[in-house]
Amino acid sequence: MFKKIKLAAIFALGISAHGIAQTPVSTGPYTFSIVKENAVGSIENQCQTGTCWSFATVSFLEAEVLRKGGKSIDLSEMYNVRITYPLKADAYVRYQGKQQFGPGGLSHDVLRVVAEHGLVPQSAYSGIKSGVTEHNHGGLDALLESTVKTVLDKKLNEEGGAWKNSVNGILDAEIGPVPSSFEFNGKKFTPAQFRDELKINAAEYVSISSFTHHPYYAPFVLEVPDNWAKGSFYNVPLQDLERITENALDNGYTIAWDADVSEKGFSYLQGVAVLPASMPKKEEWWTIIHPELTPTAASRQDAFDRFETTDDHLMHITGKSKDQLGNTYYITKNSWGATNPFKGYLHVSKNYYLMKTIGIVVHKDAIPTEIRTKLGMK
């Protein structure tokens, strides 16, 4: 929960014909200069849902379409949610209720849908029922959770897979049946054909993280609740995570970002995320630029081990900025609507990013060659 804070100034956000967000550059004591800004789509709002994983990754894929020379496209977030929920339900029952079941997920869940099914435009699948104006999954999530728990409590799995029809029926009623084909700009597509038309290949994207409890330069299953699919991440030293991030943004790539946003230094209302070295006075939080902590591999690991760093939220890093003192920030696109000073964007300090990153997804080519070699990537 964020307190409502009186903002010093509010600036408009413009979108160019090429989809490049002209991010505003001032709030409170902070004045930002844009260092690098890559082409992205429009700000969206996940509303009353826990589907940031799909919104962030879809935004990332929309940017990939632009980077590859395609036109601006509005892709469906709820298509991924609709495909993924039955997979979560099946896994929950198979693990006898001993793993996460809920609305959360990670970027590799979207990439799995892309690889196995395809992509769908928002115009073909909004996931919003007729007469409803925004996403609200409170009822949907409760119904699905009740269903899978009933399967285990009453041992309905012993009667075959009929219970799966109930899961699909709930999803069809609440967000709509999965489309087998659709029309877009006067042409008929299947989801797989549309994916190929957009030149999106899920195999080109990799998950990266940085923790010391697993060997570096090897894949590992990241132990966070929303990794229900047991997806693998490449583990790299902290300095390599920084190098990958800088190399990606400087060369026109963007980044899907999973992070902890529970710190007091993360303020969507201010549009800034920072990591103060000492706790500021309440009245000085957003009136002074404070010196920041410098994260280390050890401090990152300690925060993760103590659950001080948790997988709270996924967003989309689109560029770089600097404050008036020369500190580096990452321009970050959120999915909570255009409702803060930067119309839905934040400036996240490099220190906050390095300390609070759970994992990222990038295109393989965004990774420096020597790091790719150490990871055994072709």
Q: Model-derived features: where do they sit?
A:
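A broadly tuned, weak detector of single residues within folded domains
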Residues: L7, A12-G14, N45, S107, ...
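Short, positively charged
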Residues: P24-P29, E292-T294
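Generic detector of short, well-ordered, non-transmembrane alpha-helical segments enriched
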Residues: A17-H18, Q48, V110, H313
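Bacterial Sec-dependent N-terminal signal peptides
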Residues: M1-P24
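Active-site signature of cysteine proteases
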Residues: N165-K378
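N-terminal, helix-rich and Lys/Arg-enriched segments in bacterial and organellar proteins
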Residues: I5, G41, W53, H316-I317, ...
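Active-site nucleophile-adjacent alpha helix/oxyanion-hole segment immediately C-terminal to the catalytic cysteine
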Residues: T27-Y216, F220-N227, G231-I255, N340-F342
